[in-house]
A protein has these predicted regions:
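Short, low-complexity N-terminal intrinsically disordered segments enriched in polar/charged residues
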Residues: 1-32
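Residue-level preference for long, well-ordered alpha-helices that form the structural scaffold
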Residues: 2, 6, 49, 102-103
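Generic recognition of short, well-ordered alpha-helical interface segments
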Residues: 8, 20, 48, 52-55
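Hydrophobic pocket/interface hotspot
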Residues: 13, 25, 33, 49, ...
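Short hydrophobic alpha-helical module
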Residues: 16, 32-35, 60-63
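Secondary-structure boundary/capping residues
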Residues: 22, 34, 66-69
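A short gly/proline-enriched turn/hairpin at secondary-structure junctions
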Residues: 34-48
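A beta-strand edge to alpha-helix "cap/lid" segment located at domain peripheries
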Residues: 54, 58-127
């Protein structure tokens, strides 16, 4: 995969995420995609395969009234992209961890994408 192809694929994935369009997100993913959310050095969520990713992504929609991931930086090398992410969201419901509906979340982090067969093979969201 070339750098422009990787960037376009990630931009399409992020657009789907920002629009709550799970179908758009899935169209960018390899069938064996692995997703990990990593916070403070610990894996807090992991999905294996497109079906598990779809289930998690669909469930996550109800948690937000608005959400946006914006690409701040992009570095590509050998089928791997490191992307600096600026994240903004407003919660739609009270969360089990005590975060209340209407809470504004603003974070910066990094996402690492790998690619296989012209699709995203893995995503690590690191905050």
């Amino acid at each position: 995969m070339t750098e422009p192809q990787a960037r376009e694929l990630i931009e399409n994935y992020l657009e789907g995420y920002n629009l709550f369009d799970v179908g758009c997100m899935l169209s960018c993913l390899h069938p064996a995609v692995v997703f990990e959310n990593i916070a403070d050095g610990s894996v807090t969520l992991r999905t294996d395969g497109k079906a598990a990713f779809e289930a998690q992504a669909t469930q996550a929609i109800e948690f937000f009234m608005e959400r946006n991931q914006h690409m701040q930086s992009f570095h590509f090398e050998a089928d791997r992209a490191e992307v600096g992410i600026e994240y903004f969201a407003i919660t739609a419901i009270d969360w089990p961890n005590g975060i209340k509906a209407g809470t504004i979340l603003q974070l910066t982090g990094q996402s690492i994408f790998t690619f296989r067969d012209g699709l995203i093979a893995s995503i690590q969201d690191i905050s």
